[in-house]
Amino acid sequence: MKRIKSFFKILGMLVLCASFTGCGVNGNIDDYAVNTGYGDSDTVKSSSGVSRDSIKVGVIHLSDPAEGSGYTYTHDIGIMGMQQNLGLSDSQIIRKINVNDSDKEATRKAIKECIDEGCNIIFSTSWGYMETTAQMAEEYPDVYFSHGTGYMSNGKNFNNYFGRIYQPRYLSGIVAGMNTKTNKIGYVAAMGSENSEVTGGIDAFALGVYSVNPSAQIYVKVTNSWYDPAAEKAAASTLLDMNCDVITQHCDTTYPQLLAQQKNVYSIGYNSDMSKDAPDACLCSVIWNWSAYYTAAVQSVIDGTWDGSNYYGGMNEIGRAHV
């Protein structure tokens, strides 16, 4: 069993990483995105830059990156990577943590605090921040806003960024399909069929599974929250009780991985490398490298080359695969 698991860890190291490099913010336009923010959607370039020494960067986080794994953690790793790449000081990074993305007032307050503290560009990292970010972008045209996931933008001072995560999702499905013995694979999903980000990942994962194991079935449990430790734990527990012997996830905590390890079955992590959390269960993880985009976006504000275009990078831009 250890030899088989080692093989799949090597496979994971080779292929399961969504690492998006940035030759420029406008280098990776979403083929399907439309400007659906508030106001005029004509794409324009920023007229002047901001000095590297004076720029301030705000980031709105859904949870606390100190948790050490998962969605917010990997975004903050990206922010720290950008900070190092550009030589910014700690005082130039303004973080707002544990901002509930379903609470528009809390979102607005966090963004306004970043503006009041002098931020030139603000990254709002969760889907639910979208509409409030769009509104704030119209109210503060001299500040740049970049929303992670979602679909709204205005082609001026407000864009959206994401990546083709369906690509490594497909590859992780291959790993799952080759490892299941019961032909039951569990998927803990943050949102249901109304959310294209989640359903696109499930579809890609399923296609990967079926490419190597057409007899396998995938069971999905929805938590209806991007971050809900109790709900994620309950969903994973239900899937394990259904005799699923591989568990994967599109949610923020490591509970699905930890429960899989407790049940002595396999798991596939998401967002960050979750093998450190469940080393005996986690075959591989679908990992984001956000620092590439964050570096390019902030650099464009410094240089005065921001043009409001959307970003949708893919695995063809990987400089190096890692888990």
Task: Label every PLM stretch briefly.
Residues 8, 25-27:
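Short, aromatic- and cysteine-enriched interfacial helices/patches
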Residues 2-11:
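Bacterial N-terminal signal peptides that target proteins for export
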Residues 18-22:
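C-terminal motif of bacterial Sec signal peptides marking the signal peptidase cleavage site
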Residues 1-2, 24:
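N-terminal hydrophobic targeting signals that begin at the initiator methionine
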Residues 11-12, 209:
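Prokaryotic Sec-type signal peptides and long signal-anchor helices
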Residues 27-322:
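A residue-level marker of the well-folded mature domains of exported/periplasmic proteins
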